[in-house]
């Protein structure tokens, strides 16, 4: 099977063109291929497929084989793949995901996509839609117990369920210990992606990410979007900010007039290969 390794701000996935390739068991393939010692290495597997309702369909599997609704970094890479590899000549695309149809605008220079802007949709703050095991209109600035310590957290769905909390120094955290405890907390029936956020100033956030099903990643597009949405709603930053991640920087903007979030960032090829499953 032919595949392509791509990354967006260091959030790397294995991409398969399912117009020409077939993956019989994507979940098992994701587990095997994502292994950084015995496989290709990546945060998961992305299948680029035909769609009856959009230009293309993106199917995502986390490194543990579980399905994912949406990934902001991966969808930018899909946009670059289909344009640079000649599957389309459009610079405005629609991509079907489990979180709905997303619109992409491709920034092309010298025949290749450099950056991609994505409409991430509206932030969903209702607990039952995130989902969070709590009543009320929102789940913002609420205390939860994690490994015997009280954390103040806020939740939102920006394509995936997210939990946002604020820290002074994200890099000082014991991620292998607290990451799984947050992800699998009883408040999150579908598990959650966790963003540990430092507010640098009104237009700059620094974020460290623990992703559901993949562990710590260098970047998360839906997570960066969630961090901006929660932080702006709480009045801790403006409606537009650069989100600095371990693997790079994403620009997130919230158009309150239409209640739509936009993410802009890079996408890059790493290498092509062939593997026997």
What are these regions (language model features)?
Residues 124-128:
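Short, charged/polar, Gly/Pro-enriched secondary-structure boundary elements
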Residues 115-117, 121-123:
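Membrane helix-loop-helix hairpins that form the core translocation module of multi-pass transporters
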Residues 1-112, 163-277:
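A glycine-rich beta-to-alpha transition motif near the start of alpha/beta enzyme domains, typified by
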Residues 1-22, 118, 130, 135-136, ...:
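N-terminal, positively charged, Ser/Thr/Ala/Gly-biased leader segments
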Residues 86, 129-131, 143, 235-236:
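Glycine-centered secondary-structure boundary/capping sites
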